Amino acid sequence: MKSLVIVFVVLLGVAMISANEEELLAILQDQRNDARGGCVNKYKRNICGTLVTPMNCIAPRTRMGKFARRFCKFMCGFC
């Protein structure tokens, strides 16, 4: 009886994964067709936007400016 329950649980899991595969492929296709072309901030909002501000993007010789231009491209408008 235990093995029958295990088989049903496994079959249910496989059915759920295969049903979601089509949705995942649609989401992946939408991300590939995104107009930004993959240009995103490489760090979360707590760094790109709070700690590093858009004013840092135009600072030519500072460490924060170099960091912003390299890792916060979407925030700086380099896309």
UniProtKB/Swiss-Prot annotation:
GO terms for molecular function: toxin activity. GO terms for cellular component: extracellular region; nematocyst. It comes from the Eukaryota. Residues 1-19 form the signal peptide. Keywords: Nematocyst, Secreted, Signal, Toxin. Residues 20-36 form a propeptide. The keyword Signal applies. Belongs to the sea anemone 8 toxin family. This is U-actitoxin-Avd8b.
